[in-house]
Amino acid sequence: MINPKITICRLQQQKNIYFLSDFHLGAPNAQSSLEREKRICRFLDRIKNDASVIFIVGDMFDFWFEYSTVVPKGYVRLLGKLAELTDSGIAIHFFVGNHDTWMKNYFQQ
């Protein structure tokens, strides 16, 4: 019997799996983060036609404090791009890192 907590991903033929991590948006400053966010979005645009699954495995953001009732301002480009990709059928799995632990179940909500 398969553990119900384990998700089995079926790959589409001729599609790839991508593992992304350590964007650290928010550090060291707003300008650097904006430039990095734009590069990440361009990369996601390049891979969207051959991606089956994307795993974001920690530290997408870089915040050393917890948000319990609000969402940090900014990064709408990246969040919108991730929504666009999931709407197109690409599975995205997000794991929190030590710099973005506040995320917890943000994407599920």
Question: Predicted regions: what is each one?
Answer:
Residues Q13-N16, L20, L25-Q109:
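Core catalytic region of metal-dependent phosphoesterases/phosphodiesterases
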